[in-house]
Amino acid sequence: DIFDDFKTTGRESNWDQIIQVGAILTNSNFQEIDKFEARCRLQPDIIPYPKAILVNKSSMIDLTQTNLSHFSLIELMMKKFKSWGTATYIGYNSISFDEEFLRKTLFKNLLNPYLTINNGNKRSDLLNIIRANHIYYPDSIKIPLNEKGKLSFKLDQIAPLNGIKNFNAHDALGDAIATIKLAEIINIQNPRLWEASLLTSTRESTEKEIDNNKLFCITETFFGKIMPFVV
């Protein structure tokens, strides 16, 4: 599996850019085999969103004086990913955020935008897995509450609450490490849920599960509220 995370200049995948990539290749026991981390400088036409830069702990020196260009960062990333071969790409909130940036960034650089779903590759999102885990096994992963008393699934809050402390939050490689540790906890405590979640990591395998099971459960999230459905 490849656990990856991107840090960006903002939330708009159409206009913002990736500034840091962190990725870790693991075996089936979540042990690190190899890793990749790199930063790049701002593209000339990009104005970073201040809050994003504060959260990512990036300085103007990082953004303007880093030797690596944006294209070179993507080129190095793709070279590393290809060397790792076919894999399941797993991130945290990756389907709605990181994957959007990856797909559009590859397209803009004239590369195959569907890296994580072509050539035998698969993709999954640990945020959705943790949400499902909370519905079916609520005591296995501790979920904090925000200031409004609602469940908060932010990685930098969930990880330390579950004993994961040796990682640099809001750093691409640090968040990839935290994602691995949380995935390992779920696999140890609820292996059936972990295995079931990976059965929907491709369109074909998802369709197969739907066709082969007359009854199954899915979870959806609406405005922060997790709702299970029997289908």
Segments and roles (model prediction):
Residues 118-145:
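Short alpha-helix plus adjacent loop in nuclease-associated cores
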Residues 1-111, 152, 157-162:
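Conserved non-catalytic scaffold segment of RNase H-like nuclease domains
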